[in-house]
Curated annotation (Swiss-Prot):
Keyword Membrane attached: no
Native species: Prochlorococcus marinus (strain MIT 9211)
GO cellular component: ribonucleoprotein complex; ribosome
Gene behind this protein: rpsK
GO BP annotations listed: translation
Keywords: Ribonucleoprotein, Ribosomal protein, RNA-binding, rRNA-binding
Family the entry assigns: Belongs to the universal ribosomal protein uS11 family.
Subunit structure: Part of the 30S ribosomal subunit. Interacts with proteins S7 and S18. Binds to IF-3.
Pfam families xrefs: Ribosomal_S11
This protein's record includes keyword Membrane: no
Matches recorded under InterPro entries: Ribosomal_uS11, Ribosomal_uS11_bac-type, Ribosomal_uS11_CS, Ribosomal_uS11_sf
Identification of the protein by name: Small ribosomal subunit protein uS11
């Protein structure tokens, strides 16, 4: 009779990362928060969809706040204290996500807007008529 395979614990090790970079991608439909170390390796991440919101509610500021709190909680468990914040996109969850990171106990040293702006590249989609 075959023996069942032994289940091993999580392969992720709890590493001590004191400084990091928070990437907030805020679109009109969702907000994604990724927290990386200074080398760019992801320590924790969360999004409005992963926090349990569906559909149009993913684009709300409250959903962005919930996602940022969840990502910050996991980063704090791994010893993160100081962060730089890079914000990308035009969404409504930008400010609330930054505020949630600060309330969670992370010290913000820098906030930078890295939204890509075209120097008249591709043609824009046609206007939506409702």
């Amino acid at each position: 009779m075959a023996t069942p395979a032994k289940k091993t614990g999580s392969k992720k090790s709890k590493r001590n990362v004191p400084n990091g970079v928070v990437h907030i991608q805020s679109t009109f439909n969702n907000t994604i928060v990724s927290i990386t170390d200074t080398n760019g390796e992801v320590v924790s991440w969360s999004s409005a969809g992963a926090s349990g919101f569906k559909g149009a509610r993913k684009g709300t500021p409250f959903a962005a706040q919930t996602a940022a709190e969840a990502a910050a909680r996991r980063a704090l468990e791994q010893g993160m204290r100081q962060i730089e914040v890079l914000v990308r996109g035009p969404g409504s969850g930008r400010e609330t996500a930054i505020r949630a990171l600060q309330v969670a106990g992370l010290e913000i040293t820098l906030i930078r807007d890295v939204t890509p702006l075209p120097h008249n590249g591709c043609r824009r989609p046609k206007r939506r008529r409702v």
